[in-house]
Amino acid sequence: LRKSLSLKAQPIDLIKANDIYCINVLCCAFDSDIANNVHNYRKIKFLPKALQYVNVLIKRISKYRFYPTKVISNNKVIYNGDLVVCAFCNGRYFGGGFEIGKDANVQDGFIDLNFVSTLPKRLILYYIFLMLKKRLDLGKLYFHDKLKSVDLITRQEVNIDGETYQPGRYHLEIVSD
């Protein structure tokens, strides 16, 4: 920590979502539901932070309701349907240290899109395992892209850098310098 205070400051990109600036991750599917509700559950002593999120995931899965999500880029719909994971990343990690933005870089000028479409309940543990192993990209239902701007339309609450925001339409664009 002390050494970091003497390092030269580096410029980073931001994601601008309407009038909200995002340094790390904007998410809006089951991943957002967990992030928005993790603090409503009692922490289990001696359980690492990442596993606290897994604990909440297991408790919330039966209560989760899917919401249609539409993602548009350059006037073309790139996704329309239900999602389990919907993360627009500038940084690589979210909630408890999970690596969601595998190719995200705060200085590359792109938003790193990471989606997992609705999956059968029998595959949930497999995808949790992939996420814990930082290999979500190995899942057949995983979608990835890198874009400079994208529009999101969702009826689910959105989580931006740990804060909860209302459902709706969000125009996301990368802001540099």
What residue ranges belong to the model's regions?
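Gly/Ser/Thr-rich active-site loops/lids in small-molecule metabolic enzymes
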Residues: 43-52, 102-122
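ATP/nucleoside-binding phosphotransfer catalytic cores, i.e., glycine-rich phosphate-binding loops
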Residues: 73-75, 80, 105, 115-177
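A generic structural signal for short beta-strands and their flanking turns/coil linkers
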Residues: 65-67, 82-84, 107-111, 146-148
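Short linear motifs in intrinsically disordered
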Residues: 2-11, 55-64, 103, 139-151, ...
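Glycine-rich phosphate/pyrophosphate-binding beta-alpha loops
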Residues: 31, 87-101, 164
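Short acidic/glycine-rich loop or secondary-structure boundary segments that cap or lie
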Residues: 31-34, 79-81, 93-97, 121-124
